[in-house]
């Protein structure tokens, strides 16, 4: 019998829930007034977060504190909240692109990252039955020993029953102790995942040139969107009529350590397995 491993909810400190929470709703735009898609919104130190829609809309329940708005193409935004708000407009400023870096010399095509040994019969899943897994993140750790230019990011989804599923790939440089995860992307990487009970293999070639300096990196897979109308229809369906795998996405599990984020902007936690991301490209000699 196939084992389904669902990554479990991490308990938040009880003190978070002792504070009064209230709803904040709004829209996120750029300096031209155009919507900014899939912004991570929340309070990182409390582990509270969500992801805005493709239209930049967001809704979150928080205590009085400062909301943060994170997107790889924009400077981090901050907004203090102390009362409910139904019509908040957040304007994000575009980040400046770093100067191009050119490295001479010979290159060798190779894999920077491979999954490890597969945990046969086990799968890891994302659950969108309540829309709560938007922002959940898991991936793999890679070590670049020499400068490395990423050309392909590969992963497999074994089945997906989440309509409108969009995933995001992120790349973080790991620095310091305690570990700090710094997102090095300047352009987002998204992929649409079709509804299918069959295997789907993805080979993503980033639009921007991603040159890794020697060091440790966390390459992650995150759910950022799903069809909320489908979520509502699922919730209205009697439990006896639901398919056990409806509104769920599954991947294989591999024996190689990684990190896991329960929700958008929550802290990253060590886990002993990963979901099988591979990275290949050119290593400079």
PLM regions and their residue ranges:
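Short Pro-Gly-centered beta-turn/loop motif in secreted/extracellular proteins
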Residues: 34-36, 59-66, 212-214
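Hydrophobic beta-strand segments
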Residues: 39-43, 67, 102-103, 169
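Extracellular beta-sheet/turn segments enriched in Thr/Pro/Gly and aliphatic residues
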Residues: 83-105
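A short, solvent-exposed loop/turn motif at the edges and junctions
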Residues: 68-80
């Amino acid at each position: 019998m196939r084992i389904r491993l669902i990554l479990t909810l991490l308990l938040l400190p009880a003190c978070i829930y002792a504070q009064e929470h209230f709803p904040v709703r709004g829209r996120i735009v750029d300096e031209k007034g155009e919507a900014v898609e899939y912004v991570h919104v929340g309070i990182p130190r409390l582990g509270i977060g969500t992801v805005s829609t493709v239209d930049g809309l967001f809704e979150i329940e928080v205590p009085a504190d400062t909301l943060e708005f994170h997107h790889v193409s924009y400077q981090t935004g901050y907004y203090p909240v102390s009362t409910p708000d139904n019509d908040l407009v957040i304007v994000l400023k575009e980040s400046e692109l770093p100067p191009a870096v050119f490295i001479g010399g010979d290159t060798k095509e190779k894999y920077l990252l491979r999954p490890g040994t597969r945990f046969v019969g086990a799968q890891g899943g994302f659950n969108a039955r309540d829309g709560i897994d938007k922002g959940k993140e898991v991936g793999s750790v890679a070590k670049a020993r020499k400068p490395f230019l990423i050309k392909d990011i590969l992963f497999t989804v074994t089945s997906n029953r989440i309509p409108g599923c969009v995933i995001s790939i992120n790349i973080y440089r790991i620095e310091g102790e305690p570990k700090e995860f710094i997102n090095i992307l300047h352009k987002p990487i998204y992929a649409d995942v079709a509804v299918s009970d069959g295997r789907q293999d993805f080979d993503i070639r980033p639009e921007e040139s991603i040159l890794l300096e020697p060091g440790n990196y966390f390459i992650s897979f995150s759910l950022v969107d799903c069809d909320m109308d489908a979520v509502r229809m699922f919730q209205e369906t009697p439990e006896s009529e639901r398919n056990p795998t409806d509104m769920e996405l599954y991947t294989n599990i591999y024996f190689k350590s990684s990190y896991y984020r329960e929700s958008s902007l929550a802290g990253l936690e060590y886990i002993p397995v990963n979901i099988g991301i591979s990275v290949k490209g050119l290593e400079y000699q």
